Amino acid sequence: PFGHSGERAISTFFSEGKGLRLKEIQPDGEQLSTMEWEDLTHFEGNANGFAVLTATRPGNEGGLRMSYATLGAFMKYPKESLPKKPTAAIADKKYGFFQTDKAFFQDVASDMGMIPNKSGNDIGFERHPLAYLVEAADDNCYTISDFEDGINLGLVSEDFALEYLIKLVKDSIDTSKYKTLETKEDRISYLRALAIGSLINDAVKVFVENEGAILNGKFPYSLMDMSKYKVQM
């Protein structure tokens, strides 16, 4: 819920601000572990999302009580905060749970049959297959919607938008319909819907073509990394 700016603000509070004192002072006299301190000084929204979804509160046992399959699909980065980016694989780009949620995270991953990919005491797994689709949906919609906002705010010209989006919509655009749309907002909304549709179809194609590798934990890319529209994204 904090966005990337919020992540940086929280991280800076603990690494440079008043939160720095918590590294040494704990109510029970114990110091935070290296991993716990990393969770605070490199705060990660994906890990916080997992905590929000699963946190037990008075009268609310198990948080939102989502199915393990839903939580598995949510877990884009199924590893702890350290080591940082141990490989170039997309699943190792960030981390997906705080130390306080480690036991439950491992329980979900184990129950879903997610493939362990770390050695020693490090905790990490290959992605749940559906996490690739969740990531693609997130990337596709936000990228195009942010672009649409830029156009509607006058930061991007309509002509440039059409030039940018044409490779995404050229196979599906109805030019006669497009010409009947009277306002810029309607025209851009039409292009946005077509563009997202093209990206969805391509993501599905990449997923199906690589399903075997994905199921076996051998697909270290995002779906959009392999998309024919990667340049546009």
Language-model-detected regions and their locations in the chain:
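Sequence-structural signature of the catalytic-core scaffold of metal-dependent phosphohydrolases
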Residues: 2-191, 200
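C-terminal subdomains that position terminal phosphate/3'-OH groups for nucleotidyl transfer/ligation
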Residues: 171-233
